[in-house]
Regions:
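Conserved beta-propeller blade repeats
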Residues: 18-34, 61-79, 89, 111-131, ...
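Flexible loop/turn segments at secondary-structure boundaries
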Residues: 42-43, 183-184, 206, 229-231, ...
Length: 612
C-alpha cells in the first residue's frame, strides 16, 4: 500500500494528492482496528489485526465508513451514491471467504431507501442506531434496527434536525441532541416510551455536544457552554442537576468517556490543535497524553477501556492511526501515511506560524501562516498570497494536512489561513459575531487581513481568495463586494446567492441554514444585500469554480448561475463540474484533475512562475 519516488518538489501537487490517508472508525474487543484508507482513490474499509496485518474489506464505487457489530465478525457499512449523502446501511460479514475485497453486491442491505438519509450513530449488542429523514424528508427520527431480525423501532420522532443520539444502557431511552433555533446551539432531550423530556433549555444560546450516558443510566455526560464562554465537561441528571467536572476559561473542551465509565479522555482545543488528557470519572486530572505532532485527533475507545484508537492529522502528518495506552498516556503509531509518500516529501512539508491580526473595529483575527521555505521577503521582495477560507461558517481552520496548501507554499506563495469572526474554537462571543445581519462584518475581516499581509512578507496587491462551501461564498463575496482588493479567486461549492441557496437547498438543510443566515420570509432584502451575485457587475478578478453535480447542500445551480452571468458579461470564469461528486471532491482522480488546474490558475494570476 505504498509508493516511493525520490526528490519530489513540494510544488508537485499531484504527488501530494496521491499520499494515502488513514483514519480509524472502530476497534473490537480483540484489538482489531476498522480503518478507512484511500490508497485506491476513495476511502474504503481496511482491517488492521492486532499483529499489524492489513486486510482490505471493501472496494465500493464510492467512499464508505463503518463500525464493528458487537460480538460478531461483521461490520455495518455506511455508503452513499456519488456524494449525494443519502447514506444507506449495509452488513458485511467478515467470516465469509471472498476473492478480494467486497463490492456493493457482497453487502447485505440493513437499512435501504435511496431517496433518504440513514446516518449511522452507534452500535449496541444486537442493534444498530441511526437517524433518518425518511418520514417526511425534513425531520430526523432516531431508529434502532435489530441485526438478527431486521425489526426497526423508532426511539424518537419529535421533529427537528438530529445531530446526535445516545441509547441508554437499558435500551429504553435515547438522549437526543437537536439543533435549536439559536445559531450554533443545540438542545438535549430524553425520549422514552413516546414522550420527550427536555434536559436543556431550547431558548438557551448554548452548544451541547458529545452527549453520553453514565454507565448506570442515572444521567448524562456532555460538553457544554451553557452560561459559559467556552465549553466545559458537565454531568447532568434528569432532575436538572448540573455538576461541572472539567472547566477552562480559555479553551473549548470535549469529552470521550471510557465504556466502563472509569476514565474520561478530555480534548482541549488550543488554537487549531487538540491536546489530550486523561481524567477520572469525577474530572480529576490523571495524566497528559503526548502526541507526536501538534494536530487534530479523532477518538474511539476500545470495548475493554484499556486503549484508545486515535486518528491524527497535522501539517506534516497526512493521516496516521495511533494506539493510546490509557495506563501510561503513551500513543504509538499503528499505521502511518508517510509510508506511502515519496522519499523526503514529509520532511519538506511546512509548519504554520500562529498570528493575531487587528480588525477594523478593534477585534483580533486568529490565523495561521504558511510561508515558502526560501522566503523572498527576507531580501525585500514581497510575494503573492492566498487566503484559504474555511467552510461552516460554524467551523474552524485547524492544524491539519492540506496537500493544496502545501503545494501553494512549494510554488512560492504565502498562504494565510484565518479564523475570521464566526469561526468556532475561540469562544461563544467570537463565533456569534457573524450571525444574521452581522454577516458583512465577517466579510470586512478579509480587508483587514489584506492590509496586514506585508507583516509576513506578502504583497497586498497580489492576494487571491480560495475557499470551499461557506469559504467559497466568502471568495465570491470578496471578489464582488471588495473588487479592488483581490487578484483572483477559487470558489469550491460556494453559494453565489443566499436567497437562491436557501430556496433550492433541501428542506432539511434550509431549516438548518436559515437560523445562521436569516429567514427568507422576513429577511429577504438583507439576504439579497449579503449575496455576491447582487454585486456581480463589480467583479473584475478572474474566477475559477469547482462543483459536484450531486451536491445536496449547495446546489450546482449556485455555480452555474454565476458562470452564466459572467459569461454574459464577457468576464473570465472557468467552471469544472464533476458528475460523480457532491459537496466537495472525494475521489482522487477528480482531485488530480481539479486542484492542479486551480493551483496553475493561482500562480499564473499572482505572477509566480508555474513549477516545472
Amino acid at each position: 500500500m505504498s509508493k516511493h519516488r525520490a526528490d519530489v518538489p513540494l510544488s508537485d501537487v499531484r504527488t501530494l494528492l496521491e499520499v494515502p490517508l488513514w483514519e480509524p472508525f472502530d476497534i473490537d474487543d480483540e484489538g482489531r482496528i476498522l480503518a478507512g484508507y484511500d490508497g485506491g482513490g476513495t476511502t474504503q474499509l481496511v482491517e488492521i489485526a492486532a499483529d499489524g496485518q492489513l486486510t482490505e474489506l471493501t472496494a465500493l464505487s464510492g467512499r464508505c465508513s463503518g463500525r464493528y457489530l458487537v460480538a460478531e465478525r461483521a461490520v455495518v457499512v455506511q455508503h452513499d451514491l456519488n456524494g449525494n449523502e443519502n447514506t444507506q446501511l449495509s452488513r458485511l460479514d467478515l467470516d465469509v471467504e471472498r476473492v478480494g475485497p467486497a463490492s456493493e453486491h457482497d453487502l447485505d442491505p440493513l437499512v435501504y431507501d435511496p431517496e433518504f438519509m440513514h446516518n449511522l450513530v452507534d452500535v449496541q449488542p444486537g442493534l444498530v442506531v441511526f437517524t433518518t429523514n425518511r418520514r417526511n424528508g425534513v425531520d430526523f427520527d432516531v431508529v434502532t434496527v435489530d441485526c438478527a431480525t431486521g425489526q426497526q423501532t423508532t426511539m424518537y420522532a419529535g421533529g427537528g434536525y438530529v445531530a446526535d443520539a445516545s441509547l441508554s444502557p437499558s435500551g429504553r431511552e435515547v438522549a437526543v441532541t437537536c439543533l435549536s433555533a439559536q445559531p450554533c446551539s443545540t438542545q438535549v432531550t430524553i425520549s422514552v416510551d413516546g414522550g420527550v423530556a427536555p434536559i436543556t433549555d431550547p431558548a438557551d444560546h448554548a452548544l451541547h455536544t458529545g452527549v453520553a450516558w453514565l454507565p448506570d443510566g442515572t444521567g448524562l455526560l456532555m460538553s457544554s457552554n451553557h452560561q459559559r464562554e467556552f465549553r466545559g465537561i458537565v454531568r447532568v441528571r434528569p432532575d436538572g442537576t448540573w455538576a461541572w467536572l472539567v472547566e477552562s476559561d480559555e479553551h473549548d473542551l470535549d469529552v470521550y468517556p471510557s465504556p466502563d465509565g472509569v476514565a474520561l479522555l478530555v480534548v482541549r482545543h488550543d488554537d487549531g490543535a487538540t491536546r489530550l488528557a486523561i481524567h477520572d470519572d469525577d474530572g480529576r486530572h490523571v495524566r497528559d497524553v503526548e502526541l507526536p505532532a501538534d494536530g487534530v485527533v479523532s477518538v474511539r475507545w476500545a470495548p475493554r477501556s484499556d486503549r484508545v484508537v486515535l486518528g491524527l492529522t497535522a501539517p506534516r502528518v497526512p493521516g496516521d492511526i495511533l494506539a493510546l495506552d490509557v495506563s501510561t498516556g503513551t500513543a504509538d503509531v499503528v499505521v502511518s501515511s508517510s509510508s506511502g509518500a515519496p522519499d523526503g516529501m514529509i520532511d519538506k512539508l511546512v509548519e504554520p506560524t500562529t498570528h493575531r491580526v487587528p480588525a477594523a473595529d478593534g477585534e483580533t483575527i486568529p490565523c495561521f501562516v504558511y510561508r515558502p521555505p526560501s522566503d523572498a521577503a527576507a531580501e525585500g521582495v514581497r510575494g503573492g498570497v492566498v487566503f484559504n477560507l474555511h467552510g461552516g461558517p460554524e467551523e474552524q481552520a485547524q492544524r491539519l494536512f492540506n496537500p493544496v496548501v502545501q503545494a501553494m507554499v512549494g510554488a512560492g506563495l504565502t498562504v494565510v489561513v484565518p479564523n475570521i469572526r464566526g469561526s468556532t474554537g475561540y469562544g461563544k462571543r467570537w463565533y456569534s459575531l457573524d450571525d444574521g445581519r452581522l454577516r458583512l462584518d465577517a466579510i470586512a475581516d478579509l480587508l483587514a487581513l489584506r492590509e496586514w499581509v506585508p507583516e509576513v512578507g506578502g504583497d497586498p496587491e497580489r492576494v487571491a481568495l480560495y475557499g470551499a462551501s461557506y469559504g467559497g461564498y466568502l471568495v465570491l463575496a470578496g471578489l464582488t463586494m471588495q473588487s479592488h482588493a483581490w487578484r483572483a479567486g477559487v470558489d469550491i461549492v460556494g453559494m453565489s446567492s443566499l436567497v437562491t441557496f436557501l430556496e433550492n437547498t433541501p428542506e432539511y438543510r434550509r431549516a438548518l441554514r436559515e437560523r445562521e443566515y436569516g429567514y427568507l420570509d422576513v429577511e429577504r432584502q438583507f439576504l439579497l444585500a449579503a449575496s455576491p451575485i447582487t454585486y456581480l457587475e463589480h467583479l473584475a478578478a478572474p474566477l475559477f469554480v469547482i462543483h459536484g453535480a450531486n451536491d445536496p447542500r449547495v446546489p450546482l445551480s449556485e455555480s452555474e448561475q454565476i458562470k452564466a452571468a459572467l459569461d454574459g458579461a464577457g468576464l473570465a470564469c472557468e467552471l469544472m463540474v464533476f458528475d460523480d461528486e457532491g459537496h466537495g471532491l472525494s475521489r482522487r482522480e477528480n482531485r488530480l484533475e481539479a486542484y492542479p488546474a486551480a493551483l496553475s490558475f493561482l500562480v499564473d494570476r499572482l505572477g509566480v512562475p508555474v513549477p516545472e
